[in-house]
């Protein structure tokens, strides 16, 4: 060892992390969530969601997926979250039209304050702080990992909520990590 330091001095036995049974991926014959996950969409209904204007979420549910219904407005989870890890699979339609921000523009809002951009950026240039995987108009993504229209994209988002002092100023800033299709787009971004 180093000058009186033993290996026991650097070994910790508490707190013991909880055991979480990993889920299976969809390529393995059907996706299952990890044992500690809160499932927000079961492939059948939007019972965990609501309209941001109040009332039921009225997007279209079919064939195990849900689809944006522009006429019905935005939706949000009924349950409120602070720190979380989110896994979401999404795609833009094969027949998508438009250019730049008019091509499948959507987003995942974190506590209603920060938006992880969802947009078709496959061969579709736009301003870089508004492309897929950006923290909209705040942080440029490290890469463009967008798949072709009609192919599934995967976001894994890890978010740590801000904390505040009594005067309303930040005690700790929020952080977000965004991984799209296995590629890091945001790495502990504040």
Where is each model-derived feature located?
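Carbohydrate-interacting regions of secretory-pathway proteins
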Residues: 1-190
């Amino acid at each position: 060892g180093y000058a009186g330091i033993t290996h026991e001095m650097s070994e910790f036995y508490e707190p013991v992390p909880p055991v979480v049974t990993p889920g299976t991926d969809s390529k393995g014959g059907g996706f299952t969530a990890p044992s500690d996950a809160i499932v927000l969409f079961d492939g059948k209904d939007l019972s965990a969601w609501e309209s941001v204007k109040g009332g039921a979420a009225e997007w279209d549910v079919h064939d195990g997926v849900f689809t944006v219904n522009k006429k019905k407005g935005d939706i949000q989870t009924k349950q409120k979250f602070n720190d979380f890890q989110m896994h979401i699979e999404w795609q833009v339609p094969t027949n998508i039209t438009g250019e730049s921000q008019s091509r499948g523009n959507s987003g995942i809002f974190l506590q209603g304050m920060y938006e992880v951009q969802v947009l078709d950026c496959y061969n579709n240039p736009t301003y870089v702080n508004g492309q897929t995987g950006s923290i909209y108009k705040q942080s440029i993504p490290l890469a463009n990992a967008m798949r072709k229209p009609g192919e599934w994209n995967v976001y894994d988002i890890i978010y740590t909520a801000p904390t505040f002092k009594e005067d309303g100023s930040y005690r700790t800033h929020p952080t977000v990590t965004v991984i799209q299709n296995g590629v890091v787009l945001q790495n502990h971004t504040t």
